[in-house]
Amino acid sequence: MTAILERRESTSLWGRFCNWITSTENRLYIGWFGVLMIPTLLTATSVFIIAFIAAPPVDIDGIREPVSGSLLYGNNIISGAIIPTSAAIGLHFYPIWEAASVDEWLYNGGPYELIVLHFLLGVACYMGREWELSFRLGMRPWIAVAYSAPVAAATAVFLIYPIGQGSFSDGMPLGISGTFNFMIVFQAEHNILMHPFHMLGVAGVFGGSLFSAMHGSLVTSSLIRETTENESANEGYRFGQEEETYNIVAAHGYFGRLIFQYASFNNSRSLHFFLAAWPVVGIWFTALGISTMAFNLNGFNFNQSVVDSQGRVINTWADIINRANLGMEVMHERNAHNFPLDLAALEVPSLNG
């Protein structure tokens, strides 16, 4: 016993720090990924709050027409946003010390880059921390794999898309209306609604919601009665109990008769894997779609694809969408260019006649 106590006392400060960082007994697990996650997310959150409240207008298009995004400059919670870094900066790394003054840094939208880069580092480390805690506890690694879907989506809109388009000014603004503006412009320029990967993402999100509601309602409807009519059904469950709290056979029988037998899972493990995999794979595909459209590999173009025997166009819904796209495109960044590329003449008229 004496020897053991002596060894503990001789443990270095660094050793004790390592043990504390990797201890699963802490109320909140830190982990080595947490060492980087905590400061980056705190920085991103702090700057976001300050900038959302008080940042001055930003020259997003690089044409000396600042756009207001903060509460103190006339916005509300819905219209407010962190305005993306100016097109004049492009993809340049733009920390505070690269600007001539803090006023210049704010005018060119420096906070957006600061927030986005710290945020992406932070959420990537959060994903690593999920894996790390799973590893320490002897669990399988699929929690971190599932979280990779929103991480991929955030990376696509905040980093990959600006890289492909050549400027952080094309990144998604950090606000409600700014997000909607990003979506509308993205549709106008890339026809995302006609991209199969976006369609898979829609199926993933809506399908995941449907399956979650179906599973929750089936389980809630087939609980094993443990309470009286005067008590909440939730009182019939005790945390850590070994026996099942619902009758999976009854749920399987109900759903199998409602649809057909093989539409219902008879294995709880495969069911829950499916519930996790469906939305995750869908969001993976959407992130991949955003990342390809970043480099202008756009959605399908079926414009004027149906003609009659005289060669006259018979409009389809694809043509209606195209008309809407053109309308959205001519209205955004209206002072940054005279007309969008889609409306430009295919050939320049010859000056020699």
UniProtKB/Swiss-Prot annotation:
Signal peptide bounds: none
Recorded catalytic activity of this chain's protein: 2 a plastoquinone + 4 hnu + 2 H2O = 2 a plastoquinol + O2
Membrane topology, record value: Multi-pass membrane protein
Residues annotated for pheophytin a binding in this entry: Y126
Propeptide span(s): 345-353
Site feature: Stabilizes free radical intermediate: H190
Keywords: Acetylation, Calcium, Chlorophyll, Chloroplast, Chromophore, Electron transport, Herbicide resistance, Iron, Magnesium, Manganese, Membrane, Metal-binding, Oxidoreductase, Phosphoprotein, Photosynthesis, Photosystem II, Plastid, Thylakoid, Transmembrane, Transmembrane helix, Transport
Residue positions where Phosphothreonine is found in the record: T2
Residue numbers binding a quinone: H215, S264, F265
Record note on modification: Tyr-161 forms a radical intermediate that is referred to as redox-active TyrZ, YZ or Y-Z.
GO cellular component, one term: photosystem II
One GO molecular-function entry: chlorophyll binding
Keyword DNA damage: no
Binding site for chlorophyll a ChlzD1: H118
Membrane-spanning ranges: 29-46, 118-133, 142-156, 197-218, 274-288
PROSITE patterns from the UniProt entry: REACTION_CENTER
Annotated site residue numbers, Cleavage: A344, A345
Residue positions binding [CaMn4O5] cluster: D170, E189, H332, E333, D342, A344
GO biological process: photosynthetic electron transport in photosystem II; response to herbicide
UniProt-listed Pfam families: Photo_RC (PF00124)
Misc: 2 of the reaction center chlorophylls (ChlD1 and ChlD2) are entirely coordinated by water.
Subunit field text: PSII is composed of 1 copy each of membrane proteins PsbA, PsbB, PsbC, PsbD, PsbE, PsbF, PsbH, PsbI, PsbJ, PsbK, PsbL, PsbM, PsbT, PsbX, PsbY, PsbZ, Psb30/Ycf12, at least 3 peripheral proteins of the oxygen-evolving complex and a large number of cofactors. It forms dimeric complexes.
Role summary: Photosystem II (PSII) is a light-driven water:plastoquinone oxidoreductase that uses light energy to abstract electrons from H(2)O, generating O(2) and a proton gradient subsequently used for ATP formation. It consists of a core antenna complex that captures photons, and an electron transfer chain that converts photonic excitation into a charge separation. The D1/D2 (PsbA/PsbD) reaction center heterodimer binds P680, the primary electron donor of PSII as well as several subsequent electron acceptors.
Protein name: Photosystem II protein D1
Organism for this UniProt entry: Oryza sativa subsp. japonica (Rice)
Gene name tied to this protein: psbA
